[in-house]
From Swiss-Prot:
UniProt keyword list: Ribonucleoprotein, Ribosomal protein
Purpose: This protein is located at the 30S-50S ribosomal subunit interface and may play a role in the structure and function of the aminoacyl-tRNA binding site.
InterPro entries: Ribosomal_bL19, Ribosomal_bL19_CS, Ribosomal_bL19_sf, Translation_prot_SH3-like_sf
GO molecular function: structural constituent of ribosome
PANTHER family the UniProt entry points to: LARGE RIBOSOMAL SUBUNIT PROTEIN BL19M, RIBOSOMAL PROTEIN L19
Biological process according to GO: translation
A GO CC term assigned to this protein in UniProt: cytosolic large ribosomal subunit
Protein name: Large ribosomal subunit protein bL19
Ranges in coiled-coil conformation: none
Length: 124
């Protein structure tokens, strides 16, 4: 490992001690708590939707969450190790055969549903 990779690995280890990041992948429904600063107040705003993509690039890892808000599709990209991401909770796990679910952008209503994954063996 070169010097940059070593430094990034140390930073990731330090950030993982502070907050727990669950094991999730594309197709899972997530509830992401985001820190919002309003003047002097800080509050947590939750954003719930389907994870349609995950990019694992060390400290630059991110994931995309899509939800339907008032009949309009809204996508938001969250940096995984950002201090503004307060919490990540897996609401339900989905069965998909793709790593990127961009095809959901063209689907509406029941066509955009994802079946729930029922694991026979317990998750690690």
């Amino acid at each position: 490992m070169n010097l940059i990779q070593t430094l990034e690995a140390e930073q990731i280890a330090k950030l993982q001690e502070q907050k727990s990041i669950p094991d999730f992948r594309a197709g899972d429904t997530l509830k992401v708590g985001v820190r919002v600063v309003e003047g002097e107040r800080i509050r947590i705003q939750f954003y719930e939707g389907v994870c349609i993509a995950r990019s694992n690039k060390a400290i630059g890892s991110s994931f995309t969450v899509r939800k339907i808000s008032f009949g309009e599709g809204v996508e938001r990209v969250f940096p995984l190790y950002s201090p503004n991401v307060d919490s990540i909770e897996v609401v339900r796990r989905g069965v998909v055969r793709r790593a990127k679910l961009y095809y959901l952008r063209g689907r509406r209503g029941k066509a955009a549903r994802i079946a729930e994954r029922r694991d026979v063996r317990p998750s690690k």
